[in-house]
């Protein structure tokens, strides 16, 4: 019987291994598109010329009249400018089954009077039409940088910041767009500027060189459509992480940005390991969790087999990345999320209300996480030399911390709080009140929020967070009563003022009450 159980335990991992292993059949190459990439030749030595070419690449990448593959090629050309040998960079990181990069050199000929003396060429021939297409007049539909209203002026930027800083600022921002385009495409602009703030504070990106919102959206649209560009950037990260130690400042900044996309799309998998397995609670011995534990073990083996590219399997669209979805191990994931919402308050905003959520296991996870005995790791008792007295005191403290809190967290997706209040200053400090304070407004939760004719005062998400930090449970209920009382008084004043009109100037009360209810004010 033991042998039979062992066979079942290893079936999942062996099955996954056999599916993903190469069968040794004939290799039939697929169709590949050709992408033109432009690199600087040895005759381009002036910093002003280099920065002009960089901003030209950026402008072409935003041209909506061009195909996305062409626009992606200009972004590749821009990224390659960070290296002394762009050809070697593309040879090392640009091997891709979807595209074939064709490299053209840009040279500077002082005798040329048109196209600013630039000429596009290869070893054998020159390309006049391509040169005119690349360096000819081009109308920018929007400024590239926030510090400019018209086309980029390389001389001005170069004089202020210098070439390495300008090029580094541009390339770092392209990498930040990659991060946000992959992880939160719906909020690309907001996410980009939030992530950029750290680089602005340390001086990596100067204010005049910050991308405009239109530039961010344009680059993001190209990255979402050109998987070959994303693959090139990921391979760049892998190379920097594994093959080199003498990184430039720009490359170190790229590594910092790249850390934000490590394990992107694998949050459920990582959280299941962290809260479901590594906590090592007794619930893991349940028989209905065993299939999911075996599945998770198989996924861990698959993840480790990917080597340095493992953190990027979702970004690279590796065929196995769908196996890591929590729907493939729902019971264990549900249990882990129950533990998580108790142990980590930030996880209470994590989206747990999914169709495959096992409610019983979700509640079980919360129950064992709240249990004082389960919080003590027996594996560390001997190693740390914990005495029986110390363990008893620890159990006592844990029981006191969790005592009286028998409520369970419901599955939720979280959300910001923004409550429209009347145009009045509300003092949030607790104050004494009497039963008479509550007279004049009903106890019904739907009636206790007064309807007003204006909403000029808001509690925003930032204010709500500050309120949560500065108040305790008793303060919250007191604040709720006082806000309701103030609004009730204002409602009574409005009713007196508009008695002859019979209505409050056409205000949609239902909509306002619904907004307050949606913001959760009734449950403070």
Curated annotation (Swiss-Prot):
Region span, Homomultimerization: 440-461
Keywords recorded for this protein, A-Z: Capsid protein, Helical capsid protein, Host cytoplasm, Ribonucleoprotein, RNA-binding, Viral nucleoprotein, Virion
Residue span of region Disordered: 487-524
One of the record's GO cellular component terms: host cell cytoplasm
Feature: compositional bias, Basic and acidic residues: 487-508
UniProt function note: Forms the helical nucleocapsid (NC) in a ratio of 1 N per 6 ribonucleotides, protecting the genome from nucleases. The encapsidated genomic RNA serves as template for transcription and replication; encapsidation by N is coupled to RNA synthesis. Forms the encapsidation complex with the phosphoprotein protein P. Before encapsidation, the newly synthesized free N protein, so-called N0, is chaperoned by P.
Quaternary data: Homomultimer; forms the nucleocapsid. Binds to the viral genomic RNA. N0 interacts with the phosphoprotein (via N-terminus); this interaction allows P to chaperon N0 to avoid N polymerization before encapsidation. Interacts as N-RNA template with the phosphoprotein (via C-terminus); this interaction positions the polymerase on the template.
Official protein name in the record: Nucleoprotein
